[in-house]
């Protein structure tokens, strides 16, 4: 907002002292004004025409105080870049990725940030030049299968499977009809070690777990086909971390299963508010065999202890 108009008193004169203009100077100024009026073309009365635009040489240099004052007076600098169009609306984002409305409160504040706009722009650019997995409508499939208020267990993965037809938006899960990957086979073995009466899964689709309150979330949501880790530089991890943090703040007493160093570094829930379980990664290359992981029984024990129903770890 503009401040009060500057004082009419010439700079450097104390209050009460008037500037006296010599009579000769005043007369000279009056004669000059009369001559200028006489030289004006006929019909150029007050308000008849706009004052001429000063030449480029007469205009103040850009960046000087005079230029700043001129910009303020006119309201804008004609050479300034156009304003930032801003973040995408929630409706546009949700429509593009088929995001469930239940996650709006956790996702909307994040997608409005500059880094998220750059992330989404880079993702769209990659889609034009390479085969990106999973399909666009499955990148946020986890939001459609598990509402925030239903989350009991959070399992953190790294990035999607990079083989054709495998990834569909849930960590460690593959579509029906796709061979069960070795890591998922080890997960199933650990489940059956704790619950031996469960039938052996005939497929690797974990949508049933997701519908029962198990959030299966990768830290990187996309990948280039055949190139594991290729989309980690896009910045998905920052978005996922922020969403998990908001989930931790709004949902107490969650169970976190953090398998391997990557998951344990990417996600750091408060152990005073949540049950945090750590183990080696289920990959067959891990030093500690994952088949001995007791997390599935420990998670259910904690859920029962805190007054909630245990998770059914069977796969439909």
UniProtKB/Swiss-Prot annotation:
**Active site at which residues?**
159
Query: Could you give a single Gene Ontology term from the biological process aspect?
Result: base-excision repair, AP site formation via deaminated base removal
InterPro entries in alphabetical order = UDG_fam1, Ura-DNA_Glyclase_AS, Uracil-DNA_glycosylase-like, Uracil-DNA_glycosylase-like_sf
Q: Per the UniProt entry, what species is this protein from, by scientific name?
A: Suid herpesvirus 1 (strain Kaplan)
Q: SMART domains in the record, alphabetically?
A: UDG (SM00986), UreE_C (SM00987)
Name of the protein in question: Uracil-DNA glycosylase
Please give the catalytic activity noted in the UniProt record. Answer: Hydrolyzes single-stranded DNA or mismatched double-stranded DNA and polynucleotides, releasing free uracil
Q: Name one Pfam family in it.
A: UDG
Keyword annotations: DNA damage, DNA repair, Host nucleus, Hydrolase
Q: Please state which protein family the record places this protein in.
A: Belongs to the uracil-DNA glycosylase (UDG) superfamily. UNG family.
Give EC number(s), comma-separated: 3.2.2.27
Q: What class of enzyme is it?
A: hydrolase
Q: Which compartments is it annotated to reside in?
A: Host nucleus
Q: What GO molecular function terms would the record report?
A: uracil DNA N-glycosylase activity
Tell me the segments the record calls region Disordered: 36-91
The protein's predominant localisation is host cell
Chain intervals with Low complexity compositional bias: 36-79
Q: Does the keyword Glycoprotein apply?
A: no
Protein's job: Excises uracil residues from the DNA which can arise as a result of misincorporation of dUMP residues by DNA polymerase or deamination of cytosines. Therefore may reduce deleterious uracil incorporation into the viral genome, particularly in terminally differentiated cells which lack DNA repair enzymes.
């Amino acid at each position: 907002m503009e401040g009060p108009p500057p004082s009419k008193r010439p700079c450097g004169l104390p209050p009460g002292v008037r500037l006296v203009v010599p009579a000769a100077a005043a007369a000279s100024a009056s004669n000059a004004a009369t001559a200028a009026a006489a030289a004006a073309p006929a019909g150029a009365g007050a308000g008849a025409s706009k004052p001429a635009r000063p030449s480029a040489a007469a205009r103040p240099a850009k960046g000087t105080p005079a230029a700043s004052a001129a910009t303020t007076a006119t309201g804008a600098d004609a050479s300034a870049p156009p304003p930032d169009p801003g973040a995408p609306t929630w409706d546009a984002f949700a429509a593009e990725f088929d995001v469930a409305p239940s996650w709006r409160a956790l996702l909307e504040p994040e997608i409005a940030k500059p880094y998220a706009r750059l992330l989404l722009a880079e993702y769209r650019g990659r889609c034009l030049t390479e085969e990106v997995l999973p399909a666009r409508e499955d990148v946020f499939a986890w939001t459609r299968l598990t509402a925030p208020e239903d989350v009991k267990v959070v399992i953190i993965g790294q990035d999607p499977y990079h083989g054709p037809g495998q990834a569909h938006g849930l960590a460690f899960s593959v579509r029906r009809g796709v061979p069960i990957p070795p890591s998922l086979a080890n997960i199933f073995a650990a489940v059956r070690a704790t619950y031996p009466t469960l039938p052996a899964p005939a497929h690797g689709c974990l949508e049933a777990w997701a519908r029962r309150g198990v959030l299966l979330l990768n830290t990187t949501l996309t990948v280039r086909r055949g190139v594991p880790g290729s989309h980690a530089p896009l910045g998905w991890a920052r978005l996922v971390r922020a969403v998990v943090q908001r989930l931790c703040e709004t949902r107490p007493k969650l169970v976190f299963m953090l398998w391997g160093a990557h998951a344990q570094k990417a996600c750091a829930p408060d152990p005073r508010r949540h049950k945090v379980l750590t183990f080696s990664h289920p990959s067959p290359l891990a030093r500690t065999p994952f088949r001995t992981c007791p997390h599935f029984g420990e998670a259910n024990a904690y859920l029962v202890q805190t007054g909630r129903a245990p998770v059914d770890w069977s796969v439909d």
